[in-house]
C-alpha cells in the first residue's frame, strides 16, 4: 500500500503555504494517485468566508485540472493546526468528503490525518472514506 509517511510529510509541508489570515488555522493536504503522483493543496481563506477553499479540495481540483479522474486516487493525508504551531487532529469537512466521493471508491480510498508530531514522528488516524461519509450523495 501507500507510503503513508511520505504522504503525511507532504501534507505537513504543504500546510506551511496555507493562506489563513482570518482564522490562523492552516491546513495542508496531499493526495496520492495510482501512478504515484502526489498533489498538494492548502486552505485559501477569503474575507468573504464563502469564497474560502479547503486544502483537500484544492488538491483534488489540481489533480482534476491535470487530467486525473475517478479511479485515479488512492489516499489523502491532511495536516491542520495553528499557522505557526504543531498539527492537531483535522478530519476533512463534509463538503470535502462529498467532493472526494465524486472521484474515489469510498470503500477503498484511504483518509489520513496527522494527530500529533512527537520527536519528529507523526501519529495519525486512518479511515476509509466510506467510514467517514456513509450514504454519500450520488446521481
Where are these regions (language model features)?
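Small-residue (primarily alanine) positions within well-ordered alpha-helices
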Residues: 11, 29-30, 59, 63
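Short acidic-glycine loop/turn motifs at beta-strand connectors
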Residues: 33-35, 117
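Short, solvent-exposed cationic patches
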Residues: 55-78
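C-terminal binding/interaction regions
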Residues: 2-17, 71-139
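Short beta-strand scaffold segments in enzyme catalytic cores
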Residues: 24-32
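Compact, glycine-rich, soluble single-domain proteins
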Residues: 43-57
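Short Gly/Pro-enriched turn/cap motifs at secondary-structure boundaries
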Residues: 19-22
Amino acid at each position: 500500500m501507500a507510503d503513508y509517511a511520505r504522504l503525511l510529510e507532504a501534507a505537513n509541508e504543504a500546510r506551511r503555504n496555507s493562506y489563513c489570515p482570518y482564522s490562523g488555522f492552516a491546513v495542508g493536504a496531499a493526495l496520492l494517485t495510482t501512478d504515484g503522483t502526489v498533489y498538494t493543496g492548502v486552505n485559501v481563506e477569503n474575507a468573504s468566508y464563502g469564497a474560502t477553499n479547503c486544502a483537500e479540495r484544492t488538491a483534488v481540483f489540481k489533480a482534476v485540472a491535470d487530467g486525473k479522474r475517478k479511479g485515479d486516487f488512492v489516499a489523502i493525508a491532511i495536516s491542520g493546526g495553528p499557522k505557526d504551531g504543531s498539527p492537531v487532529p483535522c478530519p476533512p469537512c463534509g463538503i470535502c468528503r462529498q467532493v472526494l466521493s465524486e472521484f474515489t471508491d469510498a470503500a477503498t480510498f484511504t483518509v489520513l490525518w496527522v494527530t500529533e508530531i512527537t520527536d519528529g514522528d507523526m501519529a495519525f488516524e486512518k479511515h476509509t472514506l466510506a467510514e467517514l461519509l456513509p450514504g454519500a450523495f450520488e446521481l
